[in-house]
Amino acid sequence: AGPIASRQIVPNYPASSTSKGFHLVVNVTDPSADFTPSINNFYVNSIHVGAALNYVGVTAVPGRIFYQNGTAEEIRYAQSTVISDGATPPVPFGLSLRPDEGSDVVSTARLDAGPGTTGVRVSRFPEPYRFLQPETFLACNESLAYYQGDYFTVIKQADVTVGDDGSIDYNVPDNCISVRLIPECTELNELPEDAYASHEFAADTQCYDDVSALNWSEYGP
């Protein structure tokens, strides 16, 4: 008998577009762990918790418009930030990661007035998919004191750690599920003349036209 021909694996990834503005869409990476009701394909939005202070939450309808802010060199070396304009007149609200009290690995995402955390970015080549980094992002069911203890879905981020025996720990708290935040192209908001925000360094970002239309099981390896 002749040799068995090895099956050639042809990489297949979803087509991306380019836009300065984008929404962030929640992709629940393990559907069996999803909340009830599901938050898959929900949009990232802000949760007001004080003057110019916001947690990052989710909503069923298109949420905040984001853009990557930085020079070409800053984008290349992961020193850019992700910003969403807010308030009147518009000011930049930067996406930041604030370490949780008592934790070395879990941070809470914030969208406060200011520049945001450098290194929060949309993935680039050679990574074949587009998603927000650094991973792993989480969606967590948390009570917020600002709302008298009411529960909200809050976005957090956890660092992956490796144990002495080589085991990998994704450090996902019990009240959280792992998610990816996927950029969906949208038109960047225009700014009025009195805006404190600026789009001078709003970068072209690779994003998907319609995240909810993507069947992720069709892509790979």
Swiss-Prot record:
Domain of life: Eukaryota
UniProt note on tissues of expression: Expressed in the mycelium (at protein level).
Keyword entries, A-Z: Allergen, Cytoplasm, Glycoprotein, Secreted
Location of the protein in the cell: Secreted; Spore; Spore wall; Cytoplasm
Residues bearing glycans: N27, N69, N141, N215
GO CC annotation: cytoplasm; extracellular region; spore wall
InterPro entries documented for this protein: DUF7907
UniProt record, GO biological process: aerial mycelium formation
Name of the protein: Antigenic protein SchS34
Origin organism lineage: Eukaryota, Fungi, Dikarya, Ascomycota, Pezizomycotina
